[in-house]
């Protein structure tokens, strides 16, 4: 599989686990606004508590560079993975998606042709609404199912990989399949923790098996 230039916005549990997974086979630039986190990542010291990230930092040859320079990270990226925080306000029943939107705006400024993949937790219907709001169709959504301190493990052994994309656009259909294959390429295999109910649910979708991992592409 060819190598792709990848940028990851955010180095929390989701962002750093995805960056680590993808950096096994592709050049990855991880963007954060906190200098100390970037310095730690470049020294292969995990800024978060995660046994598998620490293990991969110590043992794997990762093509991973952390940077504060969003332009340098985004301008040549084929894919930009957005893992910015979206804090939930239970009183207002509201996800703060402003950090996600700032990343999207920067990507559109520096590299309007890049495929943007949102990994942040977002409200239902948000991806389509942000496509319409920005006029940018190149926005996909790929939800994460991760536990804190087990984020990379859950990324290496996913129960499923889901990529949402607009229907009827062959280029974005291809981009969604390519991104899913990048995740499969870095993964080890399917989680064994699925319930029979979950497996039954997965069979109702048009799934493909890769390393035993179901891939679901949704409009």
Annotate each PLM feature.
Residues 1-219:
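Structural/interface elements that position substrates and couple domains in central-metabolism enzymes
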């Amino acid at each position: 599989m060819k190598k792709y230039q990848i940028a990851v916005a955010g180095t929390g549990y989701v962002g750093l686990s995805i960056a680590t997974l993808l950096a096994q086979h592709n050049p990855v630039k991880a963007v954060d606004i906190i200098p100390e986190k970037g310095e730690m990542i470049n020294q292969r010291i995990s800024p978060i508590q995660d046994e598998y990230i620490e293990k991969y930092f110590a043992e794997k040859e990762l093509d991973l560079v952390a940077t504060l320079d969003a332009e340098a990270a985004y301008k040549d990226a084929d894919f930009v993975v957005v893992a910015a925080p979206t804090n939930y306000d239970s009183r207002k029943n509201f996800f703060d998606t402003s950090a996600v939107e700032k990343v999207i705006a920067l990507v559109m400024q520096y590299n309007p042709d890049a495929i943007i993949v949102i990994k942040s937790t977002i409200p239902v219907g948000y991806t389509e609404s942000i496509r319409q709001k920005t006029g940018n169709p190149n926005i996909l959504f790929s939800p994460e199912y991760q536990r804190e301190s087990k984020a990379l493990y859950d990324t290496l052994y996913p129960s499923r990989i889901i990529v949402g994309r607009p229907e009827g656009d062959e280029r974005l259909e291809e981009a969604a399949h390519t991104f899913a294959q990048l995740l499969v390429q870095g993964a080890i295999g399917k989680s064994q923790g699925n319930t029979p109910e979950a497996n039954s649910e997965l069979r109702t979708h048009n799934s493909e098996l890769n390393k035993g991992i179901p891939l679901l592409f949704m409009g």
